[in-house]
Amino acid sequence: MNDDLPILPPGFGPGSHGEEERPDCPSMPRAMRRFERPALPEPGQLSGHPIALALLERLQEALGAYRIGEQSRVIGLDRQPKADLKLLQQILGEGEVAIQVGGQRPARIQETVLAGVWWVQLQIGRGEVVGQWLEVADVPALVRRRAFAETRWPQLGELPDGLLNAGPVLVELLDAAKRHAERALATPHAVNLSLLPFSPEDRRFLAERLGEGSVTLLSRGYGNCRIASTATPGIWCVQYFNSSDRLILDTLEVTGIPQVACAAQEDIDDSAERLREIREALE
């Protein structure tokens, strides 16, 4: 993946939607991610690039070995020839999910066309790549590690005038989040703001109290789904948009990471088969 690759689409990330499109969330039906084979290079193009082929073989082994719930499988890409990485990037293509991780050492992450195979880049300055790797996982370990690395528990304080439901919603979320912090909840606790009377003041109040986290994820698997961590431990904002970018479902979810962000075991198994087909086509 070269340094100039525009992984994340315009308008992606915290603050990219208006105030009227702030927090909400319930679960959507789970389906396998779609596979669209990228435009593959001609077999002759790979003849002088054995490293690219070797990396594909290692990726095949990682997909065959990985099981959901286990430690992710990582294939380092640092110090590999740029030409081989460019070919690898062409072969793996871009999948449905893009992730942006903020903080002192930001990262950009793109799922490949193989669900559960992620291209991770660490950056400094104006996007200079200082480390990168392929990772086979339901979601990259960096996302879990950094989502709530810098958080705080908000104080309720005195409620401002003009609120309809934000006060009770915040109390409910904080109660669930504290239980989750003590012992991970067996099932996510979700609050669907789309079903509640909510004023602009409600939305501003929740946004200010919960704060803005360091992880933002965009999935094109079900139209557009935008997932963002808040600055409050365990609380995620999950929003669904239609093809016109209109907010159609707005939720807040207490969980380790929303399930819609994660590849399933069937996705991993399917990706192993797809990669096998790709490698055969390149022979």
UniProtKB/Swiss-Prot annotation:
Which Pfam families does this entry report, sorted A to Z?
A: HupH_C
Instruction: Spell out the residue ranges making up region: Disordered.
Output: 1-29
Highest rank taxon of the organism: Bacteria
Give the family this protein belongs to, as stated in its UniProt record: Belongs to the HupH/HyaF family.
Q: What is this protein called?
A: Hydrogenase expression/formation protein HoxQ
State which gene encodes it: hoxQ
